[in-house]
């Protein structure tokens, strides 16, 4: 019952406090721990069946800055996955394509936020970032302004990416460079989880129920006040 109560609170928080902050909010968007999602700015859109996983110590930060000089915009596609600790900050435009997966602690930005010589210039020529469909961005990667990542490509963990990344390749390193090519005919995207199974969301709930079955209210209290 405690989990059901928490889920009810999360749903209420998501639809009454977070949804109105989005320019567009698609259907069946799933946000785990929505109280740890920061949404700042008016021009932020999220499409159908997107999944955002937040955590108390690793919130997700979506910031589209608006001033007299800049108008940031963030567009998140269908079926995407964003993991804990991700920060997406825009002063121009950041577009993330359908079925893209973003691992933990990734930073995506379309601005340097300060000039090289004029440190009072807080916008410093932003350039749009475009991430195509079915891209996989590894943990702790940094995607810099002006970056374009082609469809199906993978960014290795800890990479720093700037410039144009072709489709169907693995890029990794600092600065990131091509490691290998990928076969574009072999991919199965996150979209298939939702379009090929009418019970996907119910299956997730069933898995969660089985995982939590051994837990109890007393055990939860002990974990907070008397952790091992």
What residue spans do the PLM features occupy?
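Beta-rich strand-turn-strand
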Residues: 87-93, 140-154, 159-163
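Short glycine/proline- and charge-enriched loop/turn segments
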Residues: 115-122, 187-192
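Glycine-rich NAD(P)-binding loop of Rossmann-like domains
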Residues: 69, 121-131
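A short, glycine- and basic residue-enriched loop/turn
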Residues: 129, 146-147, 168
